[in-house]
């Protein structure tokens, strides 16, 4: 939608400025494209959050731990296209929707910082800078440990959960099985 909005904006502004209008308003067509983009994002977020809630209810989960990515966009330059995509994601809206939908079913949502979660081995004693190694992330999406190869996102989520339990004082031994092939759920096509 972004490219279509940019194309329409350029086309409309050139028509308006040729006519001598100093501050052109967006066209009706451009407003429709904006609305369609907003509605698609809103619909997708509702589908994703509903899928999370349904999964939690089906598996008797009472606490959802999510990475706190506050200030993820600050002082980062990841390239023109990636910056546009990263800044377009409505993180606060996702947190809000998850929180109210989980609360309706008596499930709590906990935020946990993500420092070093994707760089530490799942077998490391703690998730800290001391045990973090960037060299373990050799390929995109893969985390290579001494003996095993894991999915990098699954290792990050596992370590976020470990950090949460360590912060609560609930040291739990959690199995590392399933980190190499996580469950993928298609919510919307």
Could you say what each language-model-derived stretch is?
Residues 1-189:
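Positively charged, helix-rich recognition surfaces that bind polyanionic ligands
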